[in-house]
Amino acid sequence: SPVQFRFKCSKLPTVEFFCQTANIPGISLGQATIDTPLKSIPFPGDELNYQDLGISFLVDENLNNYKEIHDWLIGLGAPQNHNQFSTLRDTGTDRFPGQTTNSPNNNTVPDGGTYSDATLTILNSKNIAKVEIRFHNIFPTSLGALSYDVQASDVNYLQANVDFSYMYYEIVQL
C-alpha cells in the first residue's frame, strides 16, 4: 500500500488537503581536508546544508491555496512597496506547532509572519501517524506557474509546485 502523509503549515491552511507530493529533504555535512605527504585526510565540518522542502498541490478552483503562497512570497519580496513586508511581519501569530517569539529586550525586529513552522506527518497503512518531520522557520522561495489548456480532452486539475527554505528539521517518532 502507498505511504500516506499530511503536510500541515498554519500559514497555509488550504494547502494541507490538496497536497499531492512532498519530500524529506536531503542533508549534507561539509568537510575539511588536511593535506599530508601521503594522503589528504577528511574531517567532519561544522556546517549542515539542507536541501529545499518541495511539495506539489492541487490548486482549488478559486485559487485560494495558490494565493496563500503567492501573498506570502509577495510580502517577503515587497515588490510594490515596503508596507507589504511590514504587513506580513505584523501578522506573526500563526506559528505551528509552537509559536516562537523574540524577547522584548533583544532589540531585533520580530520575525512575525516572515516564517512559519510546518510538519510533514507520515502515516502507516492504517492511516495512523507514525513519524513527524518538523520544519522550523520555513518560508517559500519559489512558486510554480499555472498552465491552462482549453484543448485538453480530459479533466486536468491544476497542480503547482512550491519550494521552501528553512532553518532545520527534526524527525520525531510518535
PLM region spans:
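Glycine-rich, low-complexity intrinsically disordered segments
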Residues: 1-174
